[in-house]
Structure formats: C-alpha cells, structure tokens
Amino acid sequence: MIRQERSTSYQELSEELVQVVENSELADEQDKETVRVQGPGILPGLDSESASSSIRFSKACLKNVFSVLLIFIYLLLMAVAVFLVYRTITDFREKLKHPVMSVSYKEVDRYDAPGIALYPGQAQLLSCKHHYEVIPPLTSPGQPGDMNCTTQRINYTDPFSNQTVKSALIVQGPREVKKRELVFLQFRLNKSSEDFSAIDYLLFSSFQEFLQSPNRVGFMQACESAYSSWKFSGGFRTWVKMSLVKTKEEDGREAVEFRQETSVVNYIDQRPAAKKSAQLFFVVFEWKDPFIQKVQDIVTANPWNTIALLCGAFLALFKAAEFAKLSIKWMIKIRKRYLKRRGQATSHIS
C-alpha cells in the first residue's frame, strides 16, 4: 500500500513539473515573439523610439513656426485695419469741413421780370421800349421817343453814406427769353461839368417783388448792399446780356446773383453840330440764355459708407485678435503635450 501511494505521488509531481516546463516554454516563446516584433535586440528598439520622438519634435517645431508666422500675419492685418479706421475717420472729417461745390442748370421758358435800377443823375430818359430779336434803326436820336416800359422812381438814402440821397429809376426788365425779348433805353445829358460821363445801374431779381414791397426804400437799400453796380458810357451802345445764378447758403437760404456780358459799339453821331453838345447814352438789356445756374455745396462724405468700412475694420480686428488668442493657446497645448511625451519616453528608457 505504501508503495502504491508513493507511486501516485511521484506521478502527480511529474505531471506538475511537465506543466511548469510547458508554461516556461510558452513564456519563452512569447518573449521571443515580442523581441522579434520589437527588433533584434534592446538597442534597436531604443533607436526607433528616439527616431519617432525626433520626427514628432520636428513636426511640432514646424507647427510652432507656422503658428508664429500666422500670428505675425494677423498682427499685420490688425495694424492695416487700425490704419484704415484712422484714415476713414480722418477723410470723413476732412470732407465734412471742405464740401464740394456742385453746379447744375435749370432750363426755363421765361424769367421773372428783373428790376433794372438806373441812376441817371442829370441825364434825361428819352425812350424805353421792348423789342424782340432786332432793334429797328433810330429815327430821331436825341429826341423823346416811345415810352412803353413800366417804370418807377424812388429816392432813398445811400446805405453806405447816410448823408447822400440817391434818385433811382426802376425799369421792368425782359421776360421772354425764348423770344429774345430785350429792353432798349436812350438817355440824353445836355451839360456836364465832369470829364467822363457814365450812368450807373444795378440789377435785382424781381421787379414784381419791388412793387409788392411795403418798404420800397428799405428794399432798394438792401439791393444796393447785396448786388454789384455797373456803368455804361455815353456815345456808345452798350449791350448787356444777363444770366441768373442762384446760390444755396449753409443756412438754407438762396442768394440770387446776376452775371452779365457786355459788348460796346461806338455810336456814329450824324446830328447837326449844334446838337452834338448833348451826350447820348444807349443801353440794351437781354437775357443770355434760358438756363438758371444753381450752385450749392455738397458734402461728399457718406456716413453709411463710413459706418460700413468701420464695421468691417472692427470685425477684422476682432477676428484677428480671436485667431491670435486661439493660436497662442494651441501652441501652449502642443508644447505641454510634447513635454509630457518626452517625459514618458525618458521614464520608459530608464
């Protein structure tokens, strides 16, 4: 019985030893397979790990370099956007300070009859007549003729000198510009103590406004203060071609100005010698063309365009700042990840 028990115990021990050997062989084979996968030895494995870490390092460096370049580019774009904002605001302020003059023309069929204020002094009005296109030849120069003009006489104090009283003859001017209506006036000056003889005149915008004015004296003083005066000489026929200019002031009021072109023709005096002592004056008033010139200052600065440019510039600034912020965070994250992997590789090698 004792031998039988010993034989069974030996058999169990031998079976356990066989299992241990088999397990050790399997472990050795697994180690060999792992060694085969990793490489022929320990040193080649370390070389591959160092090579992969160097590749990762080079990629990280390239990414960091490109990130820095992008940050500089966006900083440059931010500087350009700031400069554009500054220039936009500066240009807008300059355009507000210096408006551009705009000139337009309005065609009319007829004008309001202008007022012609004449200051003949000692000269006598011989004739005043409306004609169309052509002035007929003079029949009796130096003698009183037809008076078919609407005239008014007024005396008022000179607005520039309170001691001088001026006497003005107000004549209704032409209206029908398309029919080439004109007004022909003839004056005679018998005697004059002056070396040169001339008659002053000024033009104002509306003869009807003068008639309807409750204070005609003040009206004429205001006209003389606002409008320029001209002269026409004796012994000539002075042809005045008028044009009207309306200027819009900054406060919204509209100022009226007359511009004129004059042509002077010598009068061939064929009167007897006894009558030539009296000086004759001839003047013609006519509209130059049917166009009223309108002048106004226009501010070319458009606030909506400026606002749109500013919004675009500020949007570019915010986007650039946001991208720079994200790029910096990404660089910090990549740096931390690289340091972490490097520490893990060092601990694994050790």
UniProtKB/Swiss-Prot annotation:
PANTHER family: PROTON-ACTIVATED CHLORIDE CHANNEL, TRANSMEMBRANE PROTEIN 206. It is a multi-pass membrane protein. This is Proton-activated chloride channel. It is found in: Cell membrane. N-glycosylated. Belongs to the proton-activated chloride channel family. Keywords: Cell membrane, Chloride, Chloride channel, Glycoprotein, Ion channel, Ion transport, Membrane, Phosphoprotein, Transmembrane, Transmembrane helix, Transport. It catalyses: chloride(in) = chloride(out).
